[in-house]
C-alpha cells in the first residue's frame, strides 16, 4: 500500500510547530510571545508578577516561567482545564465572571501584576462578523481584568482580529496606556487575521469612567452623518462608492421630482445630488411665467432631463436659473437698498497709533528687504568661492556690499547740500593772480606740472601694461603646461620665508609719501581727512592680510614674543637658493640670539634689584616673569643627556636634505673639507644684499631663473639623492595605501561582526548545540569564501598535429583558443594602425 500524506492543517505544521515540539513547548504560539518580548524591550525579564488570561494549553505560561526572574508569581486561567506546570499557578474559570476576579484576588493578595497577557479567542464558526465582534468583546473583558490588577507603568499584551471595531479598541487602549503599538510577529501565520497589540506604561487612573469598559458603549454603532452632496455637484467626475450599502426603504435607484419643487426647496444641493430628473408641468401657471425667461433655453431643458450625466458647469447654470426664478416668483427678495456707511473720524491718539503702526510696518519691510539683499549677497559670495572666483576684484564687491554706508556716497551728499563743501579741497588748489601777487612764496609753473604729470603717467601706464602682458602670458602657459600650472598652485619652488616688518618704519614711509594741503574751511578738511583715514585703513588692512598669508608659522611664533617689540629690522633677509640657506645668516642669527638672551638675563636681574629697592615706594607694581624665561630656567635643571636628546630630535625634524647641492655640502661638512668659517665666507657674495623691493614680477622671476649661484656638486651626492628619490617612489601611493588600509579595516569589522553573531548564537539557549555549530560554520564559510576567479584561457598554436584540427586538442582542459602566425601578424597590424591614428590626433 502506498503512503498517505498527512494534511498540513492550513500551514500550522510549519517549522515553528516542529521547533516547539523540539523545545518542549505545548503550542507553536509560544514563539509569538518570545518574538514580541524581544522586540519590545524584554519586559518579561523585568516582571515579578504575570497573569495569563485564556492561557490554555499553557505555552505562554511556559515562556513566562522560563524568562521571568526566580520566585516570580505566574498565574494562568482558562475556561478549559490545563495540565499543571512547574512554577505556575493554574485554575479553571471564565474571565467574564466574578468568580475569576475573586480567585485572582485570592492568589495575588496585595500584589499587583507587572504584565498581563491575553491570547484568547472565542469559538468560531458562526460567521466572520459575529466571530470578530465576539473576539473584540473578549479583549475588552481581558482589559477590564488588566486594569484592576496592573501596577503603574505595567504592560498589557492582547490578541485582536482585524475588523471594524479595531479602531475603537485602539482608542480605549490609548486612554489607559502611554504607548500603544500593533504588531504581527513572524511566528503568526500570514493567512491568519490575528494581530497583537502591545500596551506599555499603564496610567493607573484614580477614577475610571465605567463607560470606557462597557461593550455597549464602546462598540455602539453611531448614526451616519449627512451625505455630502456638494462633492457630487462641484466634483461630479469623482465617484464615491457606497461601501456601507444603500439606505433602508430606498428600493429604487431612479428618482424624479417637479422643477417647481426644486425652485421652492431650501436645500437645492441635496436635491441635485439625489434626483435623476426634473419634470415639467406645462399647464402650471408658475412654469408658464418661468418658461418666458431667456435663461430657459433648450440646453437647460435637456440638462434637467438627466442630472446624473451633468458636469460642474451645467450644475452651476441650473443653480443660477433657480436663483432668478425665485426672484421672479417672489420667493427670494433682492435687497437693492445700499447700506450707508458712516465714517467716524479718528481721534488724535488713534491717528498717532495708526501712523506708528504704519512706520513700524514700513521699518519691518525695510529690514526684511535688507535681510533678503544680504542673503543674496552671501549666496553669490558662496557661489564665487565654490567656482574659485577669488580675485582682487573682491575689494570692489566688498565695497558694493556696504550699501548706504559706503565710503563715497555722493547721492547722500547731494541731498544734504554739502557736495560743494566737499569739493572745496580741490578748489583751493586753483590760485588767482591776485593771490599769487600777494604771496611771492606761492608759485606754480603749470607747464612743468603738466609735463611731469604726463611722464609719470606714461611710466605708470607702461608698467601696468607690462604687468598685464606678463599675467596673460602666465595664464596662457598654465593652460597648456601642466607642470607650470602645478608650480603656480604650489606658489613657486623658491618661495622665501617672510619674517615680518616693523610697524614704525611702515608708518614713517607712509607719512613721507603723503602731501597735506591746508584748507581754511573746517568742514572740508574734516571730510577729506575722514576719507583719507578710511582709505588708509583699507590699504593697511589689505597689506596686513597679504602679510598674514606670507608669514610662516615658525616666524609668527618667534616674532609674537614680547622681546621683539622694540627691535628694528636691521638684519638683511637672505635668499634661499635650491633649498640651502646661506651660512652667514645662520651664524649671525645664532649670535644675535645668544647676545639677546644674555642681555635679557641682565635686564631681569637689574629689574629685580630695582624692585627690591623701590618696593616700599611703588607697592602697586608687580613684575611678572616671561613664560619663555621660566622654561629656560626650568630647563637648567634637566640633565645633559635629556638636553642633547631633545636637540637631536629637533634638529632631525627641522633639517631635510632634498637637493644635490645640499647633499654635497653635507658630505663636505662630514668629511671635514669645509668648516663654519668657510660657510661664513661663502655667504658674502653679490646675491646677499640684493634689493628686490618695488620690482615687477616678470623681472624677479627672470632673475630667479638666471641670476643665481652655481654651486659645484659631486657624483656621490647625486647618487645619494637618486637613491633617496628611488626609495620614496618605491613607496605605494596614497590611494593604494588607503585602499589596503580600508580592506584591512573591512576584514577586521567583518570578523568582529561575526564574533558578535557567534556570541549571540552561543548565548541562545533555545537552540541545540548542533544548530549552533551549523549556524557558526555557515557564518565562517561566508567570511572564508574566496572570490571566484575566471579560468585562464589556454593558447594552442595551430601547427604540427594541431594544424587543421576540428575538435579539442589532446591534453588541453578548460577553455582554449587556437592561434597561428597569421593571427599574430593581424594583431601586429592592428596595433600599428592604432598607433598611426593616435599620432594624427
UniProtKB/Swiss-Prot annotation:
Record keywords, A-Z: Coiled coil, Methyltransferase, Nucleus, Phosphoprotein, Ribosome biogenesis, rRNA processing, S-adenosyl-L-methionine, Transferase
Gene3D superfamilies found in the cross-reference section: Vaccinia Virus protein VP39
State where composition is biased (Basic and acidic residues): 505-517, 598-607, 642-654
Superkingdom field: Eukaryota
Binding-site residues, S-adenosyl-L-methionine = 58, 60, 78, 94, 119
Q: Where is the composition biased (Polar residues)?
A: 574-585
Query: Which residue ranges are recorded for the region named Disordered?
Result: 480-534, 565-654
PTM-bearing positions, type Phosphoserine: 455, 464, 529
UniProt keyword annotation of Nucleus present: yes
Enzyme class, top EC level, equals transferase
Supply the InterPro entries for this chain: RNA_methyltr_RlmE, RNA_MeTrfase_FtsJ_dom, rRNA-MeTfrase_E, rRNA_MeTfrase_SPB1-like_C, rRNA_MeTfrase_Spb1_DUF3381, SAM-dependent_MTases_sf, SPB1-like
Gene Ontology CC annotation, any one: preribosome, large subunit precursor
The record's subcellular location field reads: Nucleus, Nucleolus
Q: What molecular function terms (GO) are annotated for this protein?
A: rRNA (guanine) methyltransferase activity; rRNA (guanosine-2'-O-)-methyltransferase activity; rRNA (uridine-2'-O-)-methyltransferase activity
Q: Which GO terms describe its biological process?
A: maturation of 5.8S rRNA from tricistronic rRNA transcript (SSU-rRNA, 5.8S rRNA, LSU-rRNA); maturation of LSU-rRNA from tricistronic rRNA transcript (SSU-rRNA, 5.8S rRNA, LSU-rRNA); rRNA methylation
Keyword tRNA processing appears in the UniProt entry? no
Q: Coiled-coil regions in this chain?
A: 360-389
According to the UniProt entry, what is the EC number of this protein?
A: 2.1.1.167
**Compositional bias annotation for Acidic residues:** 518-534, 608-621, 629-641
Which family does the record assign?
Belongs to the class I-like SAM-binding methyltransferase superfamily. RNA methyltransferase RlmE family. SPB1 subfamily.
> What do we know about how this protein assembles, alone or with others?
Component of the nucleolar and nucleoplasmic pre-60S ribosomal particle. Interacts with the snoRNA-associated proteins NOP1 and NOP58.
Q: Any idea what job this protein has?
A: Required for proper assembly of pre-ribosomal particles during the biogenesis of the 60S ribosomal subunit. Specifically methylates the guanosine in position 2922 of the 25S rRNA at the stage of 27S pre-rRNA maturation. Also methylates the uridine in position 2921 in the absence of methylation of this residue guided by snoRNA snR52 at the stage of 35S pre-rRNA maturation.
Q: What is this protein called?
A: 27S pre-rRNA (guanosine(2922)-2'-O)-methyltransferase
Recite the lineage of the species.
Answer: Eukaryota, Fungi, Dikarya, Ascomycota, Saccharomycotina
